[in-house]
């Protein structure tokens, strides 16, 4: 199947993507973002196409076992006209990227040292995960989690109610 994998639903997925849903984020400076993701999150750059006039047209990085696509908004906006980086949206974003990691505490330290803003320090949560919420220098929100325990639905609801 030439590098392709069939998902559970029979859809062919190019082998490098591993999942049917592949987030694609827009940033003001993709080269700097890739460097930050490498230093902060241990990401690996797998693919990159630079635009003829400068900037990154398209890049793919591996974060854990998942792929994230990204590119410079200034390069892509001429084509689609509707892409925007968080800064163009007043600093907000409607998407958070959740990533499970073996040690959320060490990741939080490394990410903060690399320039991430810690919005919520590592905290044991009612849903059974230790979680940190970070904002990267491009304005995207990341939630990193270390799974601590499986929590049955009834217990999850009880804990949520008790938390107020």
Regions found by a protein language model. Give the residues of each.
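Vicinal oxygen chelate
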Residues: 2-24, 34-35, 41-135, 145-164
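Hydrophobic ligand-binding cavity/cleft-lining segments
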Residues: 28-31
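C-terminal catalytic core of tyrosine-transesterase DNA break-rejoin enzymes
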Residues: 138
């Amino acid at each position: 199947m030439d590098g392709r994998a069939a998902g559970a639903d029979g859809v062919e997925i190019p082998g490098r993507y591993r999942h049917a849903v592949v987030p694609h984020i827009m940033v003001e400076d993709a080269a700097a973002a890739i460097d930050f993701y490498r230093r902060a999150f241990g990401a690996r750059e797998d693919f990159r196409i630079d635009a003829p006039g400068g900037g990154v047209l398209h890049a793919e990085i591996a974060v854990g076992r998942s792929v994230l696509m990204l590119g410079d908004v200034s390069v892509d906006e001429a084509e689609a006209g509707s892409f925007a980086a968080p800064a163009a949206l007043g600093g907000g974003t409607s998407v958070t990227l959740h990533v499970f990691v073996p040690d959320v505490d060490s990741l939080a330290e490394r990410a903060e040292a690399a320039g991430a803003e810690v919005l919520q320090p590592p905290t044991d949560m009612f849903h059974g995960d230790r979680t940190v919420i970070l904002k990267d220098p491009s304005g995207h929100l990341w939630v990193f989690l270390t799974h601590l325990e499986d929590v049955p639905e009834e217990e999850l609801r009880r804990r949520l109610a008790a938390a107020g």
